[in-house]
Amino acid sequence: MAVVISSNGNSKSFDAKMTVYVFICVIIAAVGGLIFGYDIGISGGVTAMDDFLKEFFPSVYERKKHAHENNYCKYDNQFLQLFTSSLYLAALVASFFASATCSKLGRRPTMQLASIFFLIGVGLAAGAVNIYMLIIGRILLGFGVGFGNQAVPLFLSEIAPARLRGGLNIVFQLMVTIGILIANIVNYFTSSIHPYGWRIALGGAGIPALILLFGSLLICETPTSLIERNKTKEGKETLKKIRGVEDVDEEYESIVHACDIARQVKDPYTKLMKPASRPPFVIGMLLQFFQQFTGINAIMFYAPVLFQTVGFGNDAALLSAVVTGTINVLSTFVGIFLVDKTGRRFLLLQSSVHMLICQLVIGIILAKDLDVTGTLARPQALVVVIFVCVYVMGFAWSWGPLGWLIPSETFPLETRTEGFALAVSCNMFFTFVIAQAFLSMLCAMKSGIFFFFSGWIVVMGLFALFFVPETKGVSIDDMRDSVWKLHWYWKRFMLEEDEHDVEKRTD
């Protein structure tokens, strides 16, 4: 799973330096992404550990031990899936509260609340003595994810110099992938620590949570948030501090003007339903759906379990997950380099073909060579791992970051916070659906699960081809005239809004 906020697209160039202080702020705030990534990666490894299964899911452990057991069904357990998915359901709910907290209290206090939720959740999960304590811990971690994923990207977007905003915001996505990789490495080493290795693995999230909590005391609130809450003098002083220059009048006035426009919209959620807001709203929500139905989080959540299913031993499965995590990190750098060179549409279309081929190859190998009680021969198992890695590469430079980048740059200012909150909630909902259903789907559909995701990749590729316009280099202020009004389908909604405005003025 992936989160990115773009530059605000404003064509004006304000005088600003990339200061050491801004760099420190970016790194500290982006630790929120590392925690999110760690939580994504840690659950699959922990659910593959025998000590964890014996403690909380003895029936799954007994099923796993029997060689004659159905390979695809040995991990099928609703409570086991709830251990992973409960975090994302909680994050969905929390994101609505976090949106209000960001507006009323600011970005920094919201990050601090996120870190407190993380710490309490880590303590409960790592120290759990029964399934209920374990799930409650995961739910509190989910609250941390909901608050962190709302506040951190907004913070990064508002504190970065305009010319560097896109790249600095992808640091959040980069930290997510690094968090996944660290979790995979931790899983690999703690799996051999009996009987409490799983407690160490779950407790590891407490370290970055502490860094975020105490590090947030060193960073400032964003100028936009301060001005939005009528702290204009403090906002201007903060702007001078983060830009490293004294003359910030032009950018300051731009922020004040943007905040004034935003205040005029009394009900942003109603505004989102207007015809002119429909294109970014529909695209933003569908991109979240499609991002999850690429199947990426099914692979990232359950990589160790998946590799065990195709015949790898426990340690080898965890090591294979480390390899995929490394590929994920490195491929994110490719996305940073390509997104403003090749454009958004090219990456979406290229990766759709790329991921489709990988899913089909994996599905064909499993359907042909893996029966329900056997294992894959070593060559076929290695081919599966290779194509999983190639698949992860394609996602990491396309549907991962772009699933968030495109909505962030197409929502107009007056509905951006609310639109983004809905995008976060939508993403968390479908992440929950996949996390809760994947192991049951794997049991019911067997290798067909990969053909299922292949079908959705075809649908999303066609959607990108016909309905996602290119937004590279287009100012947000010009999005309506330069993108939506020129698009073969979306222009009808712009015309409808224009006609409504004319009728309103006439009346």
Curated annotation (Swiss-Prot):
The keyword Transcription regulation does not apply. SUPFAM superfamilies: MFS general substrate transporter. PANTHER family: SOLUTE CARRIER FAMILY 2, FACILITATED GLUCOSE TRANSPORTER, SUGAR TRANSPORT PROTEIN 8. GO terms for molecular function: monosaccharide transmembrane transporter activity; symporter activity. This is Sugar transport protein 8. It holds the Pfam family Sugar_tr. Mediates an active uptake of hexoses, probably by sugar/hydrogen symport. Residues 1-21, 469-507 are cytoplasmic. One of its GO terms (biological process) is monosaccharide transmembrane transport. The keyword DNA-binding does not apply. InterPro entries: MFS_dom, MFS_STP/MST-like_plant, MFS_sugar_transport-like, MFS_trans_sf, STP/PLT_plant, Sugar/inositol_transpt, Sugar_transporter_CS. Keywords: Membrane, Sugar transport, Symport, Transmembrane, Transmembrane helix, Transport. The chain crosses the membrane at residues 22-42, 79-99, 116-136, 139-159, 166-186, 200-220, 281-301, 319-339, 346-366, 382-402, 419-439, 448-468. It is a multi-pass membrane protein. The gene is STP8. GO terms for cellular component: plasma membrane; pollen tube. It comes from Arabidopsis thaliana (Mouse-ear cress). Belongs to the major facilitator superfamily. Sugar transporter (TC 2.A.1.1) family. It is found in: Membrane.
